[in-house]
């Protein structure tokens, strides 16, 4: 994670970063308001997102910036960036290129819906796979 924040813009200080220097981010399709995905950003990722108008996240597993679509081509063009009332969650209103945001090949990462009751329910996939992930990631 980039700990050199001196050269980053002062407006980043308004965001309430967690103890790891991260903030949760929701990506939402600008045209439909569909919630596409949840991810994390550090200061550098948020600044890069504003600068490029493309979604850049911070990968906690890879411990580096993750340019959405860098492998798949499924980039997110950012139309608007919002900060919630507590200043601890970022919302990106995006155009999802190719319509696929999820690594499973679906439009949204939120493709599983709970059906049933507390005693007899389960999660059911309610969105189709638009493209086989094996053909997305080579």
Swiss-Prot record:
Amino acids binding Zn(2+): 85, 102, 109
Named cofactor requirement(s): Mg(2+); Zn(2+)
Its EC number(s): 3.5.4.19
Alphabetized UniProt keyword annotations: Amino-acid biosynthesis, Cytoplasm, Histidine biosynthesis, Hydrolase, Magnesium, Metal-binding, Zinc
Amino-acid positions noted as binding Mg(2+) in the UniProt annotation, renumbered to this chain: 84, 86, 88
Pathway involvement of the protein, from the record: Amino-acid biosynthesis; L-histidine biosynthesis; L-histidine from 5-phospho-alpha-D-ribose 1-diphosphate: step 3/9
Reactions catalysed according to its record: 1-(5-phospho-beta-D-ribosyl)-5'-AMP + H2O = 1-(5-phospho-beta-D-ribosyl)-5-[(5-phospho-beta-D-ribosylamino)methylideneamino]imidazole-4-carboxamide
Molecular function in Gene Ontology: magnesium ion binding; phosphoribosyl-AMP cyclohydrolase activity; zinc ion binding
Any single Pfam family the record assigns to this protein: PRA-CH
Main location: cytoplasm
InterPro entries found in the cross-reference section: PRA-CH (IPR026660), PRib_AMP_CycHydrolase_dom (IPR002496), PRib_AMP_CycHydrolase_sf (IPR038019)
Similarity remark: Belongs to the PRA-CH family.
Subunit field text: Homodimer.
Function of the protein: Catalyzes the hydrolysis of the adenine ring of phosphoribosyl-AMP.
Protein name: Phosphoribosyl-AMP cyclohydrolase
Provenance organism: Burkholderia cenocepacia (strain HI2424)
């Amino acid at each position: 994670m980039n700990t050199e924040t001196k050269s980053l813009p002062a407006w980043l200080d308004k965001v309430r970063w967690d103890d790891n220097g991260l903030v949760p981010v929701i990506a939402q399709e600008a045209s439909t308001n569909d919630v596409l995905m949840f991810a994390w950003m550090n200061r550098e990722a948020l600044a890069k997102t504003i600068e490029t108008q493309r979604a850049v996240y911070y990968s906690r597993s890879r411990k580096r910036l993750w340019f959405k679509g860098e492998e798949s081509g499924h980039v997110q063009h950012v139309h608007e960036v919002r900060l919630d009332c507590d200043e601890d969650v970022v919302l990106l209103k995006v155009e999802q290129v190719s319509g696929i945001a999820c690594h499973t090949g679906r439009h949204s990462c939120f493709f599983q819906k709970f059906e049933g009751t507390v005693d007899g329910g389960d999660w059911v996939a309610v969105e189709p796979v638009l493209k086989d992930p094996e053909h997305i990631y080579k």
